Amino acid sequence: MAAIKPIKTYKGKIVPLFNDNIDTDQIIPKVHLKRISKSGFGPFAFDEWRYLPDGSDNPDFNPNKPQYKGASILITGDNFGCGSSREHAAWALKDYGFHIIIAGSFSDIFYMNCTKNAMLPIVLEKNAREHLAKYVEIEVDLPNQTVSSPDKSFHFEIDETWKNKLVNGLDDIAITLQYESLIEKYEKSL
């Protein structure tokens, strides 16, 4: 009954963006919030950092550098996703191609929006993030709650509810449907 792609183990290319306090307006500027679907926001992710005034790629922005092209794991600083509670920020990062975001901390609402959009937010200490950023690819094992480079593994914490949803590929609707018979029974009792 999976409604989203389950995350069990994931190996991907990383891109470091070690700024602290990256807010949702920096992730997806409000000028781009005119869409009514979840898709199509990727080209606008980090818009003000990603592009030069003439619209060309900013060569100094890490995700634009050739060695980071195709990265699906973002390693970033503390307090990622702070600011307004727009879910568009998670949509933009997912549409950009990120599956996992590793930060020192997250805004609570942004963290929840990631999990609701099949992205895994992971909290790790700065030394662990700096170590992982030295590698081209790293591996995440959600059932065992580890992030590994070729030479070292780091444990991370995640609420069992979020972990269950992501490991089993369950969105809110799929979870509700698990209780369909109880819901029907209750409705008949009214």
Swiss-Prot record:
Keyword Amino-acid biosynthesis on entry: yes
GO cellular component: 3-isopropylmalate dehydratase complex
Annotated keywords: Amino-acid biosynthesis, Branched-chain amino acid biosynthesis, Leucine biosynthesis, Lyase
Listed Pfam families: Aconitase_C
This protein's pathway: Amino-acid biosynthesis; L-leucine biosynthesis; L-leucine from 3-methyl-2-oxobutanoate: step 2/4
One MF term in the entry's GO annotations: 3-isopropylmalate dehydratase activity
Enzyme class: lyase
Chemical reaction(s) catalysed: (2R,3S)-3-isopropylmalate = (2S)-2-isopropylmalate
SUPFAM superfamilies: LeuD/IlvD-like
EC number: 4.2.1.33
GO biological process assignments: L-leucine biosynthetic process
Described purpose of this protein according to its UniProt entry: Catalyzes the isomerization between 2-isopropylmalate and 3-isopropylmalate, via the formation of 2-isopropylmaleate.
Family: Belongs to the LeuD family. LeuD type 1 subfamily.
Subunit structure: Heterodimer of LeuC and LeuD.
UniProt-recorded name of the protein: 3-isopropylmalate dehydratase small subunit
